[in-house]
Amino acid sequence: MRGVDLRPLRLEDPFTRERLLSYIWADQPARAERLCHAIALNRARPPQIERASAAPWLAFQLAQPQREGACRVVMHSMVLQYLPEAERRAALTSIMAAGARATADRPFAWIGLEWNSDRSEVQLRLTRWPGEGGENGTSRVLAICHAYGSWIDWRG
């Protein structure tokens, strides 16, 4: 697993872990417990997070050769709303271009956890290339979720 962040956190640093926990209110022990589990998972199997801006990093990654038989996946959660408009457009353009290049031997999937267009719900959405019946960009909502992961209502 690879990822990108403008300022990746160093969870091996005790100060960083303590600071993260300080953002959780004392009356929210379930959130603190989830964060402690996430930190432990991260420390046991640290992801490869590179310091960079999202759109250029994504364009570079998606331009790399894809192994036959492997499904390339882009996953993001609650990030699009924070990207400047030009960067958001560039990232989405890279995703759509990767989808257009996908084949049955080199499929592509895009999984996003983001607000829907009218911000009435947070959707976990999967888009696949090639899609069902050979269609490109077949998309469906897998779940409706709490914005911070407190609950998930699976839809399929």
Roles of regions detected by a PLM:
Residues 52-57:
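Conserved SAM/SAH-binding loop
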Residues 83-95:
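A short, conserved alpha-helix within the catalytic core of class I
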Residues 58, 82-84, 119-122:
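Short active-site-adjacent structural elements
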Residues 45, 69-71, 106:
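Short coil/turn segments at beta-strand junctions that form active-site/ligand-binding loops
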Residues 58-60, 92-99:
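Short, well-ordered amphipathic alpha-helices
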Residues 16, 22-34, 47, 89-91, ...:
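Domain-level detector for long C-terminal conserved domains
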